[in-house]
């Protein structure tokens, strides 16, 4: 199983540390490479970091979008996260998790097939259950 993680929030770091042993390959994409420098626990053979603009489809493809089974997005801004999620929705066989601060719009995007996580009450069990379902 492969996962693409877009952004560099603390929530993504927590999720990544949980997934590191459960996922074959982890790909990270963020526009600011220096943010990954404090993620030393994730410096492993199955982890690759990409630097680039997540809103551009070419960058997403280069970072492993097409081969990813699981995509987790937290751009730090809900509108940006939702925009990137819609760009990532080219492969209908993957699951896209979006971390949002404003849960008032979550129903709309869940109806579109996205899995929404609340940034203030991160339900990591949703991610773990998804992974276990496919192992």
Residue ranges and their predicted role:
Residues 1-135:
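Cytosolic regulatory regions of ion transport systems
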